[in-house]
């Protein structure tokens, strides 16, 4: 093991002893925010320190086996023990390396999923609705909450644009690689000749910003307009100006929200989405600078990248970033995307490990 890695692990082992002492104090819960931070840090460090203890035990087992090997009667047994301990130590070192990879500070956050219809007109809008259902069904499988924050329905069903908020521990860590262009190939319901059409939607997954800590928004930078919410055919039409449009003047970002009958709640939701978009913009700019130095296929965050194709006639879904093709399109459209999510996370981890090797 590299000395730098060993030193880091020693520091973490010392830190968990400190945390245990702090949590054992009688006044540990006097400051609840501090208590939560310590328990979260403890939960993050515990698996690393446990693996490090197992690695040190394997190191001791090697030393013991080497001593035993000096005894002719014990040599065969000692060699078996030595081989097993070395294999165990090598495996644990690889696992420790993975555990020490830098964590994304946004991984635990709730998210906003923004889906926009692109090329393909009505068919693209219908596919936007299908993607929303896919993410909603996935969220339900995770026992997350889903709420529609803003929607712009199309005439034939589906959405020109829709924003959903997904609330659940680790939501961003699971879906952050869904940002990008999603292409669909299928025969539209309106197609009389049975020809396959190609349409596309853009998905943006944004971590929910901490209003106080992450993004400072100057009220002077905002233009807030109120207007009457537009009702769908024959449904309730709001007679008050409850819909809200917020324009962030320095960036030109515009957020509309009209799904609630309360202007106050619509404004709060619009501000949440604006904060998430500003945070997302900042982080993508930072990623772009980093990507100029090191090309990353996964998590480049470029919304113009076509990341996935859904081919209905062939029943397949292909993720172009990792060349993964799955022939279970019906299950995937019903929210069974664990295999895709897991493969993307594994590839990202492999990229991080490769980068660690380059920097070493």
UniProtKB/Swiss-Prot annotation:
GO cellular component: cytoplasm
Record's keyword terms, sorted: Cytoplasm, Methylation, Protein biosynthesis
Record note on modification: Methylated by PrmC. Methylation increases the termination efficiency of RF1.
Disordered: annotated span: 283-305
Claim: Transit peptide is one of the keywords in the record: no
Sequence positions bearing N5-methylglutamine: 235
Location of the protein in the cell: Cytoplasm
Biased composition regions of type Basic and acidic residues, renumbered to the chain: 283-293
InterPro entries documented for this protein: PCRF, Pep_chain_release_fac_I, Pep_chain_release_fac_I_sf, Prokaryotic/Mito_RF, RF-1
Database matches in Gene3D superfamilies: 3.30.160.20, 3.30.70.1660, 6.10.140.1950
Pfam families associated with the record: PCRF, RF-1
SMART domains in UniProt: PCRF
Main location: cytoplasm
GO MF annotation: an example: translation release factor activity, codon specific
Family (UniProt): Belongs to the prokaryotic/mitochondrial release factor family.
Role this protein plays: Peptide chain release factor 1 directs the termination of translation in response to the peptide chain termination codons UAG and UAA.
UniProt protein name: Peptide chain release factor 1
Gene responsible for this protein: prfA
